Amino acid sequence: MSIAASVIAHIAPVPAQAYAHPMPSNRWSEMARGVAADESARPAQVVAALGTPAVFARNSEIFGDDQVAENVYVVVSGVVRICKLMGDGRRQIEAFCLPGDAFGWETGERYRFSAEAVSECRLVRVKRSVLFARAGSDPELACALWALSFAELQRAQEHLLLLGRKTAQERVGSFLLDLARRSGTTNASHVTEVTLAMSRQDIADFLGLTIETVSRTLTYLEEQGTISLPSSRRVLLRDRSALRRLDS
């Protein structure tokens, strides 16, 4: 069972606005135990068991750059962008967080980036003070924190390589493959579909490209038969081998 399915099953429908409320600890404990079949989701579930659910509307701010870093968040559903606004108005998106990802890790007292809901998001908000206080005596939690931190570091390293050395086609190809790996669905014809919750501008700001270059590259890949674009939010990966060559 995925983290999204496990957590959503325990949260009643709520209005699309930012708020949080506590959930009885026994229900969170049951939720955390219920995902043993999916070991990849286990670290996020261990951390989520200590938090409270929160819902953020599309394009709302979860926390701002330089705010006091009180919480770590686990994504249950939706997509979150981690971004930085430069002094001249340019924006760099550092990461897109999907269900099962955690964000808000800081070594200092304040957040160095902003976090915003790309779509309506269901999150679990966990106090940093609670995590650090319990990690010293809870080996499972300590291992979960290590695993989630390492996953974030790995994504950051891959993003650095993408920005520093790859061409526009390679960047877009790598981006689509990463989304397919993390959230894609494959049909009976073995075609993987990726849903783009983010806008073309979001993608451009993540890949360090212009929106025009992103659009041209997607069109080129479609003309080559590598992908299909049934709509602006749907991408079908028809030739993953070709994309993998771009990603190598």
From Swiss-Prot:
Record-linked Pfam families: cNMP_binding, HTH_Crp_2
Source species, domain of life: Bacteria
Entry's Gene Ontology cellular component terms: cytosol
Transmembrane regions listed in the UniProt entry: none
GO BP field: nitrogen fixation
PANTHER family: CRP FAMILY TRANSCRIPTIONAL REGULATORY PROTEIN, FUMARATE AND NITRATE REDUCTION REGULATORY PROTEIN
Protein known as: Nitrogen fixation regulation protein FixK
Native species: Azorhizobium caulinodans (strain ATCC 43989 / DSM 5975 / JCM 20966 / LMG 6465 / NBRC 14845 / NCIMB 13405 / ORS 571)
Organism placement in taxonomy: Bacteria, Pseudomonadati, Pseudomonadota, Alphaproteobacteria, Hyphomicrobiales
Name of the gene encoding the protein in the UniProt record: fixK
